[in-house]
Amino acid sequence: HMLQLLALVAMEPPARLDPAAVRDEKVKVLRSLRPITARDVESHSVRGQYGAGAIAGQPVPAYLDELGRASDTETFVALKAHVDNWRWKGVPFYLRTGKRLPERLSEIIVQFRSVPHSMFGDAAMKPNKLIISLQPDENIGLQLMAKLPGL
C-alpha cells in the first residue's frame, strides 16, 4: 500500500491514461528505489512493537501479551527511501505505518525545499507543503509560506 502511494507520487506522467501505461510508470519508480543495505538499516529505518497502554481511558495489552508468545513481528515501521532517477535525485521519501497509533491517518505530505532567503528578514518560515489526505477524510490542502500581518 505505501509503495503504491510512493509510486503514484513519484512516477512520471504516463504516455497514455490507460492501466498498462500507468503500471509501467509505477514499475519504473519501484525499480529506481535505492536498496537499503545492511549497513544502512540503522540510519534509514526504525521498527518496533506497541506496548501496553490505554485507548479512550480503557487499558489495552501490549502486542506480545495479545499474541501470547514471543515474536519479532513489527507493529510499527518507519523508513527513509530514495528514488534514484533524474527527477528525485537527493530527495528523501519518508514512509511510516503502524498499528495502534494515536490517530488513524493516511496522508501524503510533499514538503518543498525552503527558499534560500526570506524577504521577511530573520523570521523563521515554515516550508510550503502539499498535503493529500486519504483517511479519515479525503482532502487536498496547500500550506504556503506566509508571515503575520504587519511590519
What is each PLM-predicted segment?
Residues H1-L151:
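Secretory/organelle targeting and membrane-embedding segments
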